[in-house]
Amino acid sequence: MRLFPRWAEVLGLDARIEGWDIRLGAEAAAYRDTVRRLAGDPGVAGALVTSHKLDVYRHAGSLFDELDRYALLCREVSCISRRDGRLLGQAKDPITAGLAMEDLLGPGRRLDGTTQVLCLGAGGAGTAITVRLLEAEPAPGRIVVADKDTGRLATLREICAELGAGTVELARARGAEDADALLAALPEGSLVINATGMGKDVPGSPLSGRARFPAGALVWDLNYRGDLEFLRQAREQAGARGLELHDGWRYFLHGWSQHIAQVYGLELAPPAFERLAEVAEPLRQPTPARLDAP
């Protein structure tokens, strides 16, 4: 991991990062053993959980002394930290999503009751973004979240009910044609988000080559590396339809920095974050969202 040593130097941390791998979909004992191992090792300050957030919560949630509000709400643990000998589990994705959306919108611009949002993907990232959108004041006028997995949609429905929010429309998108139809129904100026992982975790896009973005749309792909096909589709229409494109680089940076701040008890003011972003920039993959991309 090339980024962490650079940030550790900037933040004055005498620390290194080490990967602990668990097979996807591993048995419950693997997650419980890993959390116990972390809790019992005084040399480990904490952890950032990537692909196993839901399973750590599901199988090892009872091992934590405290789970924060978002961990309980979103049924996931993305950050493990210690305070005064206690093991804490947090879900940082809703906070990360909020910070990234502030960057995306820029100073003085906000989503409001006239804005419509389509989020393709109801996994951890899509759920976090939905939670943040629902907590915004004002919240968007219409939020549509689509996924092919009915289990994910059912979980998100429960989360929305706990928030007392009935404004989210949950749609089963079995394939690209369903996603295209949801996109076609959006008005001008909508926010369109790819939170499926397609374009990074697996190649391709949730949309077909025939998809048509609404004029003036704000297009946000949470991916920052990979084939980024979703962004390439949007860029082909950007000039004619006045699209504004954003990749997931800042979302990634906010995610890592929030986890590091939690583990080491740091306060990251905006200037400190921008310094971290500056140090990270040379590691960034050119994307179709950048004007200087090839």
Which role does the model predict for each range below?
Residues M1-P107, G226:
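Phosphate/diphosphate ligand-binding glycine-rich loop within oxidoreductases
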Residues V49, N194-A195, D221:
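Redox-cofactor binding/interface segments in oxidoreductases and associated redox assembly factors
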Residues P138-G166:
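NAD(P)-binding Rossmann-fold cofactor-contacting core
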Residues P271-P294:
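A short, charged, Gly/Pro-tolerant segment at domain boundaries
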Residues A39, R152, R172-L207:
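Rossmann-like NAD(P)-binding element
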Residues G89-P94, M101, L105-E137, A146-R152:
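Glycine-rich adenosine-cofactor-binding loop
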Residues R110-G113, A136-P138, A185-P187, L207-A217, ...:
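Short, conserved loop/helix-junction motifs that constitute active-site signature segments
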Residues C79-R82, G199-R275:
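Rossmann-fold NAD(P)-binding glycine/threonine-rich loop
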